Amino acid sequence: GADLVMAGQLHGRILRSPHAHARILSIDTSKAEALEGVMAVATAKDFPVIQDRILDFAESQSSVRMQAENLLAHDKALYQGHAIAAVAAINPHIAEEALKLIDVEFEVLPSVITADEAMKEDAPILHDSLTTMFKVDRFGAGDNTGVNSNIASHVQITRGDIQQGFKEADLVIERSFTTQTVHQGYIEPFACSAQWSTDGHLTIWCSTQAIFGIRGATSAILNIAESDIKVIPMEIGG
C-alpha cells in the first residue's frame, strides 16, 4: 500500500500508450536500462508463456491470456493508456526519467470511441482471437458462435410477452441513454508493494478486498504456485 516503506525498496513507473489502437512494432529499452539507478525494465516479453484458460478472478471469470495482455500490452495497444513497459528504479524520479528513454515504434490502427461503433460489423477488431459467446440468461458458459467481433458475450434474457405488454401499456417511451465511465472514487491513494524473497516466496501488499483473486491471478500470469504467494490487504478508504 501507499503507507508501506521497506528498506531498499524500488519504485515503479509505467509507460503507457498514447494511442487508442496501435500495433507495437518494436520496443527498445536499452537506454532506459543503462540509466544509473534503474534496476529493471519489463515488457510483455518478460512474462512466461501461459496456457490460456478461464479462471475465477474474484468478482468475475476471465481469460488468463487477456488479463496478462491487459497488464502489459503484447502485440497491440488496445486503448489509450494501455501499459507498454514498466521501470523499477531506486527512486521515483529516476524511474520517470527512464520512461522518457524507452523508444516504442507504433503502427497506428483505426479505432472507435463508443460501444455502438465497436459493435458494428465493420468495426476494427481489438482482440483478433475473440469470438462472441451466446447464452440464454446470464448463467453458464454459453455457446461459441465462432464470430470474430468486439462483442465478448451476447446474453438473451426473456421475461413475459413484451409485445403484449406494449399493447396493454397506456404509454410507451423509448429512449437510449449513455453516460461517461463512472468510478466509485475511493479516497485512499492506491498502491501495491511486493517482495520476492530468495526462497521463491512472493509477498504482496495492496489495497484490495479480493485477496484470493489477487493471489490466483498472480499465480496464473506469473506461472508460480499459489502456495508461494501471500497477499496482505492494506487499509481501504472509501
Where is each model-derived feature located?
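Structural alpha/beta core scaffold segments of enzyme domains
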Residues: G1-G238
